[in-house]
Amino acid sequence: MILRYNIIMITDQLLAKYPIISDQVDAKELGVLLRELEKVLRSGAAGNIVEFGCYVGTTSLFIRRLLDAYNFAGEFHVYDSFAGLPEKTQADNSAAGEQFKAGELLAPRKTFIQNFKKTGLKLPTIHKGWFADFTPEDVPESIIFAFFDGDFYESIADSFRACDSKFQKRATIIVDDYANEALPGAARAVDEWLRRHPARLTVESSLAIIRR
């Protein structure tokens, strides 16, 4: 019980102290993400962390704060086109998601960097490009925690493809929008990956939590 209390306390302190700088994630979803990361950090696992889809840096800032709170010695890498959403495919079609179009949610790389500089936090390693263009050589070894926020089917599938050979045996993977009817491609990509890889899936808020 003490361990569980400590995990919640650190995450909640961060959420209470610092602002959420965009409307693309809410406090509940962010809390789920941070608590899962904190469990990994508390376990003492050594390795690296990746985030595919960082937008203006909202989640990246909180991830960095939590890593700093634990004196995390591994690498933190973020990946984004910084050019907005890519084109949809058939797998993403949903009447509830008509507002999600190519080019939406555009945030320049310099905006991400400026948001980090305002806080004085250490920048992660930034990779600019479409997820389809990244290869396993672009991601670090020994991934212990991954957050995929690609919105569309191919973006999530490409994130898995790039990281597949780099996940540690007991990695935790969080995928945004798994339970979001407006973005059905995210769930399709996750379900396809799970059919080929033994892992445990739970869903909280709109997030898929995958534990290998």
Predicted segments with their positions:
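A short alpha-helical cap/connector motif
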Residues: 1-174, 178-212
